[in-house]
Amino acid sequence: MRQLIRRLLLAALFVCVPAAAESPSAAALLQQMQRAYHHYNFELSLIKVRQGNIEPMRFSHALLDKSEISHLIYLNGRPSEYLKLDDQISFFEAGHEPYTLAGARMPGLWSAFLTMNLERVFESYDPVVTGRNRIAGLPVQVVRLAPKEATKYGFVVWLEQSSGLLLRLDLIDESGALVEQYMGVELRVLPEPSRWLKSLAQAKLPRAVPVAQAYQSPQLDLGWAPGWLPKGFVIMSTDRHPLVGTDQVVDYMMISDGLVDVSIYLSAAEAPMGDELVRQGATSLLRMLNDHKVEVTVVGEVPVPTAQRIAESLHPLAKGIRP
């Protein structure tokens, strides 16, 4: 019996040790995901699902000589597409003149995951390998980013096993319920850049404007500050500008944890108002009159209670300061 137990232990040792040695950590898998994005020529067809609505999209990437190009297009409804050529992003959206920003990033969480600062993100999220699965007919490894406090959504990513390319992204709430999803349905890894991306790289684009010059006002001290922010969030930008299509001037503040961006607007209340709340998938829009009789609007991919707590915490830094 003792000899049998020894043999079983030795067998288990030979089975388990190589598996542990070969299994990369969650952090290593996310690093591979970001390297893969910059390394491969590929086209990914995917859908964005939120509250029963499905939006088909296509994300493409290629390496052209010494340049790198990415293209994101929404395939239904009003035309929206975004072109990234090296560090310049061109925006093409229905109802707006096209424009190009230098030093910006493509909009949306899908693009944010591909370029996020992992070291910073790991300060407020714990990466965990949760297993293997299949997406779009391909084997994948699954990694979860669990928030270190319950004020934020968690994320689950599915990474194609051989390349590391991102194929699926889920946003989940504290209970694990799905809030929003990006799901790849077909991946094509190409031996060379597609003709489509080659032609886009040669297209005449709007003149690039540095992000710092895109605002009508320089970064300034608004005289307001949030008394509370979720773990990892810091103030990234502040300015004062008119709202698009109106003459109403608002104080603007953008906060971020390196993955999720939240916009905060403050303006003088023109009339008594009740609180307004709109939630679309992971995006919460909260509009309220705070204790200082100032209208506050918070917009971002955070749970409603978090948006409300941010809004309620805003306070003037000096008596008498109002938008």
Task: For the regions a language model picked out, list residue spans one by one.
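Short, low-complexity, Pro/Ser/Thr/Gly-rich segments in the mature regions of secreted, periplasmic
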Residues: 307-322
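N-terminal mature ectodomain segment of secretory-pathway/periplasmic proteins
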Residues: 22-97, 125-133, 139-142, 146-154, ...
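Short, solvent-exposed recognition patches
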Residues: 204-292, 304-305
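Short, well-ordered beta-strand elements
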Residues: 169, 292-301
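Bacterial N-terminal signal peptides that target proteins for export
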Residues: 1-9
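N-terminal signal peptide c-region/cleavage motif recognized by signal peptidases
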Residues: 16-18
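Acidic/charged, solvent-exposed loop-and-adjacent secondary-structure segments enriched in E/D, K/R, S/T
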Residues: 91-113
